[in-house]
Amino acid sequence: MEELKLRAPAKLNLHLEVVKKRSDGFHDLSSLFTLIELFDDITLKKNSNSIELIESIPIKQNIVLKAANLLKDLFSVKEGVKIELVKSIPDQKGLGGGSSDAASTLLGLRKFWNLDISDQDLAEIALTLGSDVPFFIYGKTAWAEGRGEILAEYPYKKKYYLLFLPALKISTKNAFEQASFVPRPKISKKNFTSDQSFNSF
């Protein structure tokens, strides 16, 4: 294969509850993830034996490079790849742009390098890159628990959303570290839709 074009979608957290901080430093959460039609564009091109990233907005320690190198090393792939990344998803807005780019890179390279690996195994690899990267491997609206890797497909009718993107940037890590844990009514995947309708949270 000489070239493969991919679209990496953004996500919305329709509900996000940070449940508690874990002993491993991560946080347990309860959330509802859905994809929206806002995309980064990724192109994979044949390269000799190295991995090269060309990006529209340079990002230090890009997760796309980590994903590509990880897959190459795990499967002892001899071929290289040139990755062109054009960013449209705003950074540090909670839209999962970096995680989506990583997942799309893993999915694309599976096909590009003709690797025999299931979605489930690919999701386990994805988890080493970030807690919400596995969600983008499956690419369906899902209720997420644990770090975000315990996913249950959620029946949710397509809706339209209006996004407001303030100039303020907030890192996910800092936001989670400042979360306060106070008693509140628990929202679950069973009652989310009705609670949303009555604006109870």
Language model features with spans:
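DPxDG-like acidic metal-binding loop motif
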Residues: 93-123, 135
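ATP-binding N-lobe of GHMP and related small-molecule kinases
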Residues: 1-93, 111, 115-120, 155-156, ...
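Short, glycine/charged-enriched secondary-structure capping and boundary segments
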Residues: 29-30, 99-100, 177-179
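Conserved, helical-rich catalytic subdomain that frames metal- and/or nucleotide-binding sites
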Residues: 136-138, 143-201
